[in-house]
């Protein structure tokens, strides 16, 4: 038991086979750095304009080789605002020659900045699946979490993506992500998606494919908020009480390997923030070219309760 009087996550899981990965994961997720044009209150990577841990060209090249050798199918790109990495456009074009599916997680408003306004067309041309963060469907709530002026810019970018065919054409997928604006669990995803679709279409004529409801994980900037407001213990107990073993088979960490900005390997992006590298001797993407990790035991922590609470945190398949 921890000081919170909550079992360690590993001990909580009775069916330990679900804490093992697939032998040949299909998804490679990469975090290209925490550089971002906004500073969100819930951000688990502490993203912001002053962050300097950008992934370098050499690491991108190692990722491409490892992706090919490992016969991965999906490349999942996150940050920060991944578009701000100077190698981003080049990498998208290169990896599109090898990946069946490319996912980019965007904050939307970076695509309204003049230096990045060409990227939506690149997404369209490469059939990139866009997973866009939109914490709510009205300005007041979004402003509290992401800052004043973010919501109208997000709406403008969504309109532009719709104009390019996103959310409308079969091969141009636009998914949105909801984060709770506080120390509570997200509502049921299906009902929330219906509300999002109605509100965004009725008010702005915006359409999208799916909504993913993410539970805020108690790490990074959100953890700082919880401790500052003396909410950490209560929130962890809330996650623990909502633990649902039925979520375990579908956890993305079971079918994924995650690469940090410096090329280090993790079971998920949350473990990257917690500095919990994968088990075994292979711990850098450059080693994947000549080594196969095989079935791995997933390295767990208390934050894993965030992905297994309630119906599970789909996260656009983040968890």
Each language-model region and where it sits:
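Short cysteine clusters
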Residues: 36, 40-43, 253, 268, ...
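Alpha-helical structural signal in soluble globular domains
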Residues: 66, 90-98, 122-126, 157-160, ...
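C-terminal accessory regions of radical SAM enzymes
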Residues: 240-274
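Core AdoMet radical
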Residues: 27, 47-56, 70-85, 95-115, ...
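Radical SAM enzyme [4Fe-4S]-AdoMet core and its adjacent flexible, acidic
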Residues: 138-252
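Flexible mid-to-C-terminal extensions adjoining Fe-S/redox cofactors in radical SAM and related proteins
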Residues: 264-319
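Residue-level recognition of short loop/turn positions
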Residues: 39, 106, 261-263
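Conserved alpha-helical substructure of the radical SAM core
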Residues: 2-79, 83-98
């Amino acid at each position: 038991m921890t000081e919170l009087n909550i079992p360690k996550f590993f001990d909580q899981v009775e069916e330990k086979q679900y804490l093992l990965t697939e032998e040949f994961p299909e998804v490679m997720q990469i975090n290209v750095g925490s550089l971002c044009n906004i500073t969100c209150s819930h951000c688990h990577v502490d993203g912001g304009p002053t962050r300097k841990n950008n992934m370098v060209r050499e690491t991108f090249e190692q990722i491409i080789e490892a992706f090919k050798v490992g016969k991965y199918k999906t490349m999942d790109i996150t940050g920060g605002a991944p578009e701000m990495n100077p190698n981003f456009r080049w990498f998208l074009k290169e990896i599109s020659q090898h990946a069946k599916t490319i996912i980019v997680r965007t904050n939307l408003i970076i695509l309204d900045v003049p230096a990045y306004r060409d990227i939506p067309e690149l997404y369209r041309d490469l059939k990139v699946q866009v997973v866009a963060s939109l914490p709510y469907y009205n300005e007041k709530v979004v402003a509290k979490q992401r800052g004043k002026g973010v919501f109208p810019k997000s709406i403008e970018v969504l309109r532009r993506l719709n104009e390019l065919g996103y959310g409308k054409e079969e091969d141009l997928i636009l998914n949105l992500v909801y984060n709770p604006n506080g120390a509570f669990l997200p509502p049921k995803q299906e009902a929330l998606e219906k509300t999002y679709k109605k509100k965004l279409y009725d008010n702005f004529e915006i359409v999208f494919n799916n909504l993913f409801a993410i539970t805020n994980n108690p790490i990074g900037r959100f953890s700082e908020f919880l401790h500052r407001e003396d909410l950490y213990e209560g929130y962890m107990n809330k996650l623990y009480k909502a633990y649902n073993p039925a979520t375990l088979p579908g956890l993305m960490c079971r079918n994924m390997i995650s690469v940090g900005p410096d090329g280090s390997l993790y079971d998920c992006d949350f473990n990257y923030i917690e500095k919990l590298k994968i088990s075994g001797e292979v711990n850098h993407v450059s080693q994947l070219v000549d080594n196969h990790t095989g079935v791995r035991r997933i390295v767990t922590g208390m934050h894993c309760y965030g992905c297994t609470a309630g119906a599970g945190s789909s996260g656009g398949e983040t968890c």
